[in-house]
């Protein structure tokens, strides 16, 4: 039987000092011997997705203590990608993922915690905590802060739904009046919570459900809704149940690496493709898989992208649906149910929402779907749960409203979630492209690409930084037919792999959204749509071909054939490569770029791998 990890600091006379310190935190005599459950919170007043999390740790703790555990909360950092966007702050976003993972590991291992609840929400926080949870491999439950309500405003007497990207595009569009731009800005982000579309934060919170590490509704229940309170309480109860199964019953199915195994990663990626999730999820799933010692690679993603249909279309891919609409249609469990009926899901994987009593099928995703898939459940409480809707009242308070939709969206022919027969498209919302531009692959969010742009041929317009590209787009350098190339923005070359939401938004605002393509070794916000191809690997700073592209080069993109090609002969490419090598210390570095890079970012860059490896640390440089 596994011994409680916390016994290291709570048992034996030689631990009298540690026990004295535990007592100073509020631990009583009769508490020693109980499991110590770490609560990793990420409250901050900087981020709307986290501004309401201050009291959530206490809520989880109350359920843990009622179930017989000791709850101890700590906090991690949280960067708001939207506020950090478009300036030097974005260099810190992806590296913060590694800091979050490390900080969770440090706190949990330093204090010998027995299990973990992760209270996350936004872009790098959920992935960072996921990496830590799989690294630690102790019982864990994820519970996020939830999505914000979609914005709503009237323009020309017409009520429209909005999100963050609408505010950015309107602000850069000279055809939008100052009055309308201000109205959109004030309405786009009305409540606390992660931005309201299928952007990175919501995509990742949905994927934790598919991985089996969070409860049904985690990815879709609004931050403002009173029903979300129960998710926090249940997270506390479930982590205690998992801890008892592992430490008292020697049940290793309660451990995250036995839940989030290869099949579970396939489920998560299948969901991601089906719902047209953010391309950043590829980066984070690859990173998490490495922490779990799961051999899940770009080749698996490429294979799956050809098989999985696009079943759920949400902003920014359409203005019609937001996360509140996904929830009304059954949330993640509704999408997984359709994937199961299409024969595309592994339902024999374990899930934290299900008890494993040893009988066949118990503790698995199959049993969770039987209860929570709105198309098959007979549980009226579950149906009531998925009818939770928005109130339309601006607020930063969690659980501040209890509005309901009049009915569920069970329309699998024309609704928010479709069956395979009526899919938005028979190929999914993400694709892996490869060719001489990206020998190790690159990612495009096909859910946001207009059908007319699935094949594209254009002339390269090369920029050595995002800043230069923005200036070029707004200054009129970029014209219809161009392929904007932004390089040296990868994990190592940026460093930090900036998001390119501003360049893509400005292309739209100038009427070039369907007339140009953009490729980069950086990445894109979950709010990006259009022919935007990121994660080019190897990156420019690692010797990738993207560093050899010159202005005017012909670039051919063919999404159906999964191809991206620089139409330059091998002889010419080899000559360019030799010329680059001849530059010595200046080889594979941006020409003329003026950018301050702090010591912290330089340390990150020294160990960073390219995007096809998840932009994680290069372990070969750390292992003996």
Curated annotation (Swiss-Prot):
<dbReference type="GO" id="GO:0009099">
    <property type="term" value="P:L-valine biosynthetic process"/>
</dbReference>
<keyword id="KW-0411">Iron-sulfur</keyword>
<dbReference type="InterPro" id="IPR056740">
    <property type="entry name" value="ILV_EDD_C"/>
</dbReference>
<keyword id="KW-0100">Branched-chain amino acid biosynthesis</keyword>
<dbReference type="GO" id="GO:0051537">
    <property type="term" value="F:2 iron, 2 sulfur cluster binding"/>
</dbReference>
<feature type="modified residue" description="N6-carboxylysine">
    <location>
        <position position="124"/>
    </location>
</feature>
<dbReference type="GO" id="GO:0004160">
    <property type="term" value="F:dihydroxy-acid dehydratase activity"/>
</dbReference>
<feature type="binding site" description="via carbamate group">
    <location>
        <position position="124"/>
    </location>
    <ligand>
        <name>Mg(2+)</name>
    </ligand>
</feature>
<feature type="active site" description="Proton acceptor">
    <location>
        <position position="525"/>
    </location>
</feature>
<dbReference type="Pfam" id="PF24877">
    <property type="entry name" value="ILV_EDD_C"/>
</dbReference>
<dbReference type="GO" id="GO:0009097">
    <property type="term" value="P:isoleucine biosynthetic process"/>
</dbReference>
<keyword id="KW-0001">2Fe-2S</keyword>
<dbReference type="GO" id="GO:0000287">
    <property type="term" value="F:magnesium ion binding"/>
</dbReference>
<comment type="similarity">
    <text>Belongs to the IlvD/Edd family.</text>
</comment>
<keyword id="KW-0028">Amino-acid biosynthesis</keyword>
<keyword id="KW-0408">Iron</keyword>
<keyword id="KW-0460">Magnesium</keyword>
<dbReference type="InterPro" id="IPR042096">
    <property type="entry name" value="Dihydro-acid_dehy_C"/>
</dbReference>
<dbReference type="Pfam" id="PF00920">
    <property type="entry name" value="ILVD_EDD_N"/>
</dbReference>
<comment type="pathway">
    <text>Amino-acid biosynthesis; L-valine biosynthesis; L-valine from pyruvate: step 3/4.</text>
</comment>
<dbReference type="InterPro" id="IPR037237">
    <property type="entry name" value="IlvD/EDD_N"/>
</dbReference>
<comment type="subunit">
    <text>Homodimer.</text>
</comment>
<keyword id="KW-0479">Metal-binding</keyword>
<dbReference type="InterPro" id="IPR004404">
    <property type="entry name" value="DihydroxyA_deHydtase"/>
</dbReference>
<feature type="binding site">
    <location>
        <position position="123"/>
    </location>
    <ligand>
        <name>Mg(2+)</name>
    </ligand>
</feature>
<dbReference type="GO" id="GO:0005829">
    <property type="term" value="C:cytosol"/>
</dbReference>
<comment type="function">
    <text>Functions in the biosynthesis of branched-chain amino acids. Catalyzes the dehydration of (2R,3R)-2,3-dihydroxy-3-methylpentanoate (2,3-dihydroxy-3-methylvalerate) into 2-oxo-3-methylpentanoate (2-oxo-3-methylvalerate) and of (2R)-2,3-dihydroxy-3-methylbutanoate (2,3-dihydroxyisovalerate) into 2-oxo-3-methylbutanoate (2-oxoisovalerate), the penultimate precursor to L-isoleucine and L-valine, respectively.</text>
</comment>
<comment type="pathway">
    <text>Amino-acid biosynthesis; L-isoleucine biosynthesis; L-isoleucine from 2-oxobutanoate: step 3/4.</text>
</comment>
<feature type="binding site">
    <location>
        <position position="195"/>
    </location>
    <ligand>
        <name>[2Fe-2S] cluster</name>
    </ligand>
</feature>
<feature type="binding site">
    <location>
        <position position="81"/>
    </location>
    <ligand>
        <name>Mg(2+)</name>
    </ligand>
</feature>
<protein>
    <recommendedName>
        <fullName>Dihydroxy-acid dehydratase</fullName>
        <ecNumber>4.2.1.9</ecNumber>
    </recommendedName>
</protein>
<feature type="binding site">
    <location>
        <position position="499"/>
    </location>
    <ligand>
        <name>Mg(2+)</name>
    </ligand>
</feature>
<feature type="binding site">
    <location>
        <position position="122"/>
    </location>
    <ligand>
        <name>[2Fe-2S] cluster</name>
    </ligand>
</feature>
<keyword id="KW-0456">Lyase</keyword>
<dbReference type="InterPro" id="IPR000581">
    <property type="entry name" value="ILV_EDD_N"/>
</dbReference>
<dbReference type="InterPro" id="IPR020558">
    <property type="entry name" value="DiOHA_6PGluconate_deHydtase_CS"/>
</dbReference>
């Amino acid at each position: 039987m596994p011994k409680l990890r916390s016994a290291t600091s709570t048992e034996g006379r030689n631990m009298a000092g540690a026990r004295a310190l535990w007592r100073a935190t509020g631990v009583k005599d009769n508490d020693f011997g109980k499991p110590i459950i770490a609560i990793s919170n990420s409250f901050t007043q900087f981020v709307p997705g986290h501004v309401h999390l201050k009291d959530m740790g206490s809520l989880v703790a109350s359920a843990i203590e009622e179930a017989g555990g000791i709850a101890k909360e700590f906090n991690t950092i949280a960067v708001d990608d939207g506020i950090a966007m478009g300036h030097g702050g974005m260099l810190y976003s992806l590296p913060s993922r590694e800091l979050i993972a490390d900080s969770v590991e440090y706190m949990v291992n330093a204090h010998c915690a027995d299990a973990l609840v992760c209270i996350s929400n936004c872009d790098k926080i959920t992935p960072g905590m996921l990496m830590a949870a799989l690294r630690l491999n102790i019982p864990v439950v994820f519970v996020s802060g939830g999505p914000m309500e979609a914005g709503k405003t009237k323009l020309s007497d017409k009520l429209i739904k909005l999100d963050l990207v609408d505010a950015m595009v309107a602000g850069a569009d000279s055809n939008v009046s100052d009055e309308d731009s201000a109205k959109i800005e004030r309405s786009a982000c009305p409540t606390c919570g992660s931005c309201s579309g299928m952007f990175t934060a919501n995509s990742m919170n949905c994927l934790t459900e598919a991985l089996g590490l969070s409860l049904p509704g985690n990815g879709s229940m609004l931050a403002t809704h009173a029903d979300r309170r129960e998710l926090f309480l249940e997270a506390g109860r479930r982590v205690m149940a998992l801890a008892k199964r592992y430490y008292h019953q020697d049940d290793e199915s309660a451990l995250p690496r036995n839940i989030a195994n290869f099949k579970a990663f396939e489920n998560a990626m299948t969901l991601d493709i089906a719902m047209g999730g953010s391309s950043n999820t590829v980066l984070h799933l690859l990173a998490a898989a490495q922490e779990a010692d799961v051999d899940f690679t770009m080749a698996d993603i490429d294979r799956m992208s050809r098989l999985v249909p696009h079943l759920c279309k949400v902003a920014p891919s359409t203005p019609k649906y937001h996360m509140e609409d996904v929830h009304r249609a059954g949330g993640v469990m509704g999408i997984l149910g359709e994937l199961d009926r299409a024969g595309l899901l592994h339902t024999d994987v374990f899930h934290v929402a299900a008890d494993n009593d040893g009988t066949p099928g118990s503790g698995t995703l199959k049993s969770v779907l039987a209860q929570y898939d709105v198309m098959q459940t007979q549980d009226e409480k579950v149906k009531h749960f998925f009818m939770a809707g928005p109130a339309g009242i601006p607020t930063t308070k969690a659980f501040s409203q209890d509005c309901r939709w009049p009915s569920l969206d069970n329309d699998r022919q024309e609704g928010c979630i479709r069956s395979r027969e009526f899919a938005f498209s028979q190929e999914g919302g993400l694709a892996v492209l490869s060719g001489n531009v990206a020998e190790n692959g690159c990612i495009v969010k096909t859910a946001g690409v207009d059908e007319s742009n699935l094949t594209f041929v254009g002339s390269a317009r090369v920029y050595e930084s995002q800043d230069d590209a923005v200036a070029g787009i707004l200054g009129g350098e970029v014209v219809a037919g161009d392929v904007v190339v932004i390089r040296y923005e990868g994990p190592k070359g940026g460093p930090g792999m900036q998001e390119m939401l501003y360049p893509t938004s400005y292309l739209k605002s100038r009427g070039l959204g369907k007339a140009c393509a953009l490729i980069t070794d950086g990445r894109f916000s979950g709010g990006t749509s259009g022919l935007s191809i990121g994660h080019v690997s190897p990156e420019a700073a690692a010797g990738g071909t993207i560093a050899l592209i010159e202005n005017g080069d012909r670039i051919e993109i063919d999404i159906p054939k999964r191809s991206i090609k620089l139409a330059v002969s091998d002889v010419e490419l080899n000559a360019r490569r030799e010329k680059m090598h001849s530059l010595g210390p200046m080889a594979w570095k941006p020409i003329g770029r003026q950018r301050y890079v702090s010591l912290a970012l330089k340390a990150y860059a020294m160990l960073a791998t390219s995007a096809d490896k998840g932009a994680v640390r290069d372990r070969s440089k750390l292992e003996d």
